[in-house]
Design a protein with these regions (language model features):
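TPR/Sel1-like alpha-solenoid repeat signature
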Residues: 56, 68, 83-90, 102, ...
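Alpha-helical segment of the N-proximal tetratricopeptide repeat
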Residues: 36-98
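Long, contiguous interaction/recruitment modules in multidomain scaffold/adaptor proteins
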Residues: 1-45
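Canonical positions in the second alpha-helix
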Residues: 71-72, 105-106, 139-140, 173-174
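Helix-start (N-cap) detector for alpha-helical repeat units in TPR-like alpha-solenoids
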Residues: 46, 80-81, 114-115, 148-149, ...
């Protein structure tokens, strides 16, 4: 593996971790028209399960986090936060195709979540489904054109696709939006540019 590939892999892992933490902070977007005690208990139960899964994940217990999130998903299958966290943990555990399937489910619930588009694009990239990855990066940019990480990730994909000139543009745009973005600067340097 070349140094550039190692850097790109590290950047992908860093981004996946950022998504996981972002998902932790999302507010519950599910409709809650049912205010009976049973509904309140279910929401409380899933919130507790998600917190327990977060703790397990932070302790490095990915399998345990997955089990807990699967239980939360059974209780509340239309909660994008739960679906995204489960997708992330399952993909992190090695089943990227199941992770992709769950991210697709999450996008059915909320098609305008740019971070979910980023996450699924990263998995498609790892699976070498470059066109699908590109579709999701472009959708993420359409939703939020000011998020530098998307430009960086899209640049990485373009490098994989052999489109280095376009990749340069993406890395430069990432640096325009966030001047202290060392991974984007290193990626430009690896392409022969002065960052």
């Amino acid at each position: 593996m070349s140094i550039f590939q190692i850097l790109m892999f590290a950047a992908t892992l860093f981004f996946a971790f950022q998504i996981y933490h972002h998902v932790q902070n999302l507010e519950d977007k599910t409709p809650n028209n049912d205010t009976d005690k049973h509904g309140d208990r279910a929401v409380f139960a899933t919130q507790s399960l998600v917190e327990e899964a977060d703790d397990a994940y932070e302790r490095g217990e990915i399998g345990r986090a997955k089990e807990i999130l699967e239980e939360a998903y059974r209780l509340e299958p239309i909660n994008p936060e739960i679906v995204n966290k489960l997708a992330y943990v399952i993909a992190k555990g090695g089943d990227r195709l199941k992770g992709i399937e769950l991210y697709e489910r999450s996008l059915e619930l909320d098609e305008n979540d740019d971070l979910t588009h980023n996450a699924i694009a990263s998995l498609y990239r790892l699976e070498r489904a470059y066109e699908r990855a590109q579709e999701h990066y472009l959708k993420a940019l359409e939703i939020d054109e000011r998020y530098p990480q998307t430009y960086f990730n899209y640049g990485n994909l373009l490098v994989d696709m052999g489109e280095t000139e376009q990749a340069r543009k993406m890395y430069k745009r990432a640096l325009e939006l966030q001047s202290d973005f060392p991974q984007a600067r290193e990626a430009l340097l690896s392409l022969g540019d002065k960052a």
